[in-house]
Every structure is written in structure tokens, then in C-alpha cells.
Amino acid sequence: MAKEELIQFEGLVTEILPDARYRVQLDTGHEIVAYTAGKMKKNRIKTLAGDRVTVEMSPYDLEKGRLIFRHKDERPGGPPRSGPPRGQFRRR
């Protein structure tokens, strides 16, 4: 199948299912089961419930899809800090 025939939708991951599959609520209101694309697996991009994602679907089977992109969080506080708090140790 040519890439031009694939349809892209945006949605929200509502549930994580076994075997690396996800239940996704599309912006159109439909609910589908999607799996992680190979490039996301290769780059170890983790997807959690509540994440906004882009799903690629075949026009012949509108019940299944492939997660191709996980959108970054739009949190007002910025990304969470990790590691020890600053100022605890002095660099030389």
C-alpha cells in the first residue's frame, strides 16, 4: 500500500493494553486499537495513558491504527527536573 493512501488522525491514549497496544480516543469521537510504530520502538519513546498522539490508519480498516508520533506535553511549568537539587554540592 502506498503511503499516500494512509489517513492521519490525532487522539488521546485512554488505556494501555497487553502486547504493546493502546486504546485511543480519536478527536472525531471514534475509539480504536493502535500499536507502536517501529521508529518509536527503536528510539524507545514511551507512551502513557493521557498522552496526545498522532495515529496513522488504512482507509480499508478503520478499527486499527499505528501510533507514529507522541506530542510533547504543554505543561505551563516546563519539563520536570531530575537528579539531585542544585546547590547541594559545590563544583570545583
UniProtKB/Swiss-Prot annotation:
It comes from Rhodopseudomonas palustris (strain ATCC BAA-98 / CGA009). The gene is infA. The keyword Disulfide bond does not apply. Residues 69-92 are annotated as: Disordered. One of its GO terms (molecular function) is translation initiation factor activity. This is Translation initiation factor IF-1. It comes from the Bacteria. Component of the 30S ribosomal translation pre-initiation complex which assembles on the 30S ribosome in the order IF-2 and IF-3, IF-1 and N-formylmethionyl-tRNA(fMet); mRNA recruitment can occur at any time during PIC assembly. One of the essential components for the initiation of protein synthesis. Stabilizes the binding of IF-2 and IF-3 on the 30S subunit to which N-formylmethionyl-tRNA(fMet) subsequently binds. Helps modulate mRNA selection, yielding the 30S pre-initiation complex (PIC). Upon addition of the 50S ribosomal subunit IF-1, IF-2 and IF-3 are released leaving the mature 70S translation initiation complex. The keyword Protein biosynthesis applies. Residues 1-72 form the S1-like domain. Gene3D superfamilies: Nucleic acid-binding proteins. Its main location: cytoplasm. Transmembrane segments: none annotated. Keywords: Cytoplasm, Initiation factor, Protein biosynthesis, RNA-binding, rRNA-binding. InterPro entries: NA-bd_OB-fold, RNA-binding_domain_S1_IF1, S1_domain, TIF_IF1. Belongs to the IF-1 family. GO terms for cellular component: cytosol. It is found in: Cytoplasm.
